[in-house]
Every structure is written in C-alpha cells, then in structure tokens.
C-alpha cells in the first residue's frame, strides 16, 4: 500500500513486485499526480477487487500507463485516455477486459501506442479509432475475439508502423491499401479467417518489412508472375505464409528476394521440386518448407552463406544430399525428417561447424553412422532414427560435449530502443515503456524430438538446454560403446530397435542429467548394472525385449518403473516382476534342457511328417473322385475356391498397405 506522504511522486514502477492494494487504494483520493505508472504483473489475488484502482480516476498528468498482466476485469478503462490529454502510451494487455471496444469521439492527438491484446474483447474493431487517435504509431489488438473486416480507415493512418490484429476472428480480404501505404513496417494478421490471393499483397508490399499472414484461409497458386519483369520489394525481410491453403509449385520469383531474411511456407499444399532460383537467396537465415508435398531432390546449389535454420521435413524429397548445404558453416538447425532421402550421410558433414540440431529421422539413409559427426563440437541434438544405418555406434560420439546453445533460438531482437529514463523530467520516454515489449520477429525456432516415449516440441529457452541422441529403429550392431557414458549433459538417449549385443555399460551411471534411457528391442545380455541407481533424474527407462538376466535394481528412481520397462526378458527377476530371484533358472541351464528336448523332438517330427503326407495324398484322391462323379458338388467346390482366392488377394493387399503405412518402429 502506498503511503500518503508520497505527495511529490511522479513515477511509479513496481513491475513483478507483488503489491497488495488495501481498500484505501481503491477509494481514497491521492495527493500525488503521476506522469508514469508501470504496474505490470504486480497486483496479487489478495486484493478486494479485480477492477482498475480508482485512484487512477484522479490522475490527469499521465504520459505512460502500463497495467498489463494483472487480470483486471470489466470494460476497458477508456477514461484513462480521456482524463489524461498528454497520455502517449497505454498498455492493458493480459487482463480480462470484456465487451465491445469503444472510444470517445474527441480528438486525442498525443497517443501513439495502444496495446489491449490478450483480453476478452468482442465485436468489431471500432472505426472511430482512426479519428480519435490520428497519430497512432502502434496498435496491438491481438488475442481477443474481434470479428468482421479490418476498418478501412487504418489504411489512411500515415504514422502507423506496427499493427498486430493476430489471433482474432477477423475475415474477408485484407485491404490492399493497408499494404501499399508504404509506411507500415510490421503487419501481423496471423490466425484469423482472411482469404483471397496473397500474391498482389506481396508484389505491392513496398515499405512492409515483416509480413505475417500465417494461419488464415489464403488460397490459390503463387506462380503466375513474369519473373523477368518482376522486382521483389526490397523492404521485405520476413514473410510468413504458413498454415494456409496455398498450392501449386513454389514461386520461382522468390529467388529475386535478395534482401529476404526469413521465409516460412510450411503447412500448405505446395508440390513439385524446390526451384533452382532459391539458390539465389543469399541473405536467407531461416527457411521452412515443411509439411508440403514437395518432391525431387534438394538443389545442390542451395548453400546460402548466412543460413542458420532449415526445416524441410514432412515432404517427399528423394535422392542423396549431394552438395546441398556443403560448407554451410553458419547452419545451426538442419531438419530433413520424414522424406525419402537416400544414400549415406556425406563425409563433408563436418564442414557444418555451427550445426547444433541434426534431424534426419524417417528417411532411407543407409551405411554407417559417420565418425565425422564427432567433429561437430556444437552438436546437442541428433535424431537418425527410422533409417537403415548399420554397423557399430561410433565410440567417438562419447566425446561430444553437448553444450547449451543459445544459437538454437531464432534471434528476434526488439522493436525500438531499450528502456531508458529521463532523470531530468523524472519520467520514462515513450519508447522505454512500449518498445521493450515487442519483438522484431514473431517467427520462432521450434523442433520436434522424441523422448520419454512421446513427441515433444522444444522452443525458446528450453530448446537451448535440450540435448539428446536418438539412433533407434536402425540396423546397428555390435556393443554399446562405454564411451557414451561420458555424455554427462545428455537428457535423452534412445538406442532401441536395433541389433546391439553385449552388456549395458556400467559407465552409464555417469549420465547424471539423463531423463530418458531406452535400450529396448535389442540383443543385450548380462545384468542391469546396479550403478544405474545413481541416475537421480531418470524418469523413463526401458530395456524390454532383450536377453538380460539377474535381479533388477529397485532403489531410487528404479523403484518407480513399471513392469513394462523389463518385459520380454525371461531371466530377469525382482519384486516389480513378481518373480523371486531365488527360484529362477539360469539361462545356461534352461538352454541345455531345451537342446535335449530338441533331439527327442526330431524323431517325433519325422514320424509326424510321413504320416501327414500319406493322409494328405489319400484326402486329395478322395476329393478328386467325388468331384469327378458328382457335377453339383464340383460347381460348388469351384465357387468356394473362387471366393477364397478373392478373399486372400484383398487380405494380402490390406496387409501390404498396413505394413507400409504403419511402420513397426515408431
């Protein structure tokens, strides 16, 4: 609670320092006049009301107001704008304001930034917003429930430089004048119901720097442009058209976008090959063409000098990697999962010196896992699962440091200047209140990785810390290298569904950070090392379907694992398996007994085969004689045989499709 003695107070900032506002804070008339108030994330649930504190009714000199993320309810307090004629910035995002949005018809010329995003506002965006705030520079209305069309008056606001209407229920066509006005660097219309053709908007986007049209209903082809006469707008740095209904071939004219930094065309219906013109995108840092129907091979010339993140998963690309990405020392993420790529991992993979995330899952790569991977000191996530790799696991993989990599996060930067304070005027500048909130880019680097028996998406700071190796569902042979125990920073290790033999290395006890360890479906033998009880972070553990024997550890984390973690190992024993270790036969004893039984069974099998063959011949002769004598039975027999053949044929077709659609190893 604020003391009344603060009569000379002009600036109140208490961000994220939980304040408990007493009744007087809502009812009393303050003795101070503020110029800046910033109370983001600071009002606790112990207060008496969820309404905006009434002491603000008596403030008339406010320049900047930030009441974000406090769960205030009721209607939007537009009286803050009406009472404070010098107000420049208003941030009310992350609350629970409801109802339609309406503003006074009076001119308020000083307001340049308004953020009412992440609330529960409904209805249409008021057209009066343009006349009330003619010099508005930044408007954020995202994550509400606004519907209808974009007000045409926004097209005439010459000072508007940042417009975010994303995550609403807006529909119709995007006004072309909004794009062509030439002074709107950042336009975000993501996740609405806009429709129409996006090509004219891109062609005329002079002055637009970041264009986000993802998550809408834009449709049609993007190829109807004369490449020889077309000049790509030099201002466009970033385009996001993902999650729309675009189809046809990828536009060759994109190759003219020499200033383009980031391009996202994922989750559409593009088909055909990747145009050679994409090789001319020399400024490209981020490319996402995933989840389309692209085919053909990756152009060998595709090697942008500054490329950092490449996502082309979920297509039908084929062929070897050849020289694509060769010597791309800047590349951090290479995601080629879910294609039909063949061949081996090229020896030049070590030239990707900055590579941190390598995802080649679900392709047709073969050959050995190359030791050149061990030279990539920035590697922290490797997924080579569901391929046809063979041979031993390189022991040098244990030398990888798996470092934390902030480079895995897509750099966004911030719009405007950093927070500053004008101590002479004892107030924060407008940029200090508004600009520090909003990133320059809304594209986020997110990767999918299988761990803990499930698919997980990693992005942001979590991606920086995530480390893992997945070599499952291949044909790897030999022993598990004890050197893998040196991967002390690894969180997930999956070697399942291979043909590995030998014992589980006791050195795995040094995997102090590991949360998921899967060694199932191999030919491992011996006992589970008791030293593994030292793995205090282990959450998921499986050695199912091996040839392990002896008692299972039951201390620490191993007391939490269920029977499924050990199934398919008949010689394991322990409380979890409801099998006493004092009564179980050893593998060697049971093996000897089985061999003795096999010798006796050989004579029985011979006698059985002779008698079965004689009976079978007699049965066939009897059926032949009966069918020859009786024509009615003969027709019935042929009809039955025809039905059986038809059923067998369709049954085999169904099994074939099932086998190829649903892989055994997932």
Language-model region placement:
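Terminal membrane/secretory targeting segments in land-plant proteins
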Residues: 581-666
